[in-house]
């Protein structure tokens, strides 16, 4: 159930077609979880600053049941910062990513939970 959310001040017109699909496929590969369970939400056009500057920036979160922790998070950070830098032209030092390990009983899906 990985869920990746990107809040950014990058305008919608600058979000390339295929970005969500690319993020889905890359996260499926990185987490080892099926793409059919991965949700990606990119929220452009946000009023945001980072370090007092309104240059392109992103505040992100990656939620997952398991597959979250030290070395994995560093790998995800490298992957996701790289994609956001390449596709949205956001400098990696203007991206924060929060990693959240979810309890399966606290994640609902398809009328039940993952527990």
Swiss-Prot record:
Family annotation (Gene3D superfamilies): Macrophage Migration Inhibitory Factor
Pfam families: MIF
Active site: 2 (proton acceptor)
A biological process term (GO) from this entry: prostaglandin biosynthetic process
Gene Ontology cellular component list: cell surface; cytosol; extracellular space; nucleoplasm; plasma membrane
Enzyme class: isomerase
Residues with the N6-acetyllysine modification: 78
Keywords assigned: Acetylation, Cytokine, Cytoplasm, Immunity, Inflammatory response, Innate immunity, Isomerase, Secreted
Locations listed in the record: Secreted; Cytoplasm
SUPFAM superfamilies: Tautomerase/MIF (SSF55331)
Catalytic reaction list: 3-phenylpyruvate = enol-phenylpyruvate; L-dopachrome = 5,6-dihydroxyindole-2-carboxylate
Binding site for substrate: 33, 65, 98
Chief localisation class: secreted
E.C. code: 5.3.2.1, 5.3.3.12
An example molecular function term from Gene Ontology annotations: phenylpyruvate tautomerase activity
Signal peptide: none
Quaternary organization: Homotrimer. Interacts with CXCR2 extracellular domain. Interacts with the CD74 extracellular domain, USO1, COPS5 and BNIPL.
Job of this protein: Pro-inflammatory cytokine involved in the innate immune response to bacterial pathogens. The expression of MIF at sites of inflammation suggests a role as mediator in regulating the function of macrophages in host defense. Counteracts the anti-inflammatory activity of glucocorticoids. Has phenylpyruvate tautomerase and dopachrome tautomerase activity (in vitro), but the physiological substrate is not known. It is not clear whether the tautomerase activity has any physiological relevance, and whether it is important for cytokine activity.
Official protein name in the record: Macrophage migration inhibitory factor
Organism of this sequence: Ovis aries (Sheep)
Protein encoded by which gene: MIF
């Amino acid at each position: 159930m990985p869920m990746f959310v990107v809040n950014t001040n990058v305008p919608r017109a600058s979000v390339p077609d295929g970005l969500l699909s690319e993020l889905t496929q890359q996260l499926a590969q990185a987490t080892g979880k099926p793409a059919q369970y991965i949700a990606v939400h990119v929220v452009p056009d946000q009023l945001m600053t980072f370090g007092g500057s309104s240059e392109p920036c992103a505040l992100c979160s990656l939620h997952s049941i398991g597959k979250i922790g030290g070395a994995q998070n560093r790998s995800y950070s490298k992957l996701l910062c790289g994609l956001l830098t390449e596709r949205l032209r956001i400098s990696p030092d203007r991206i924060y990513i929060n990693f959240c390990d979810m309890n399966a009983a606290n994640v609902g899906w398809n009328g039940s939970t993952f527990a």
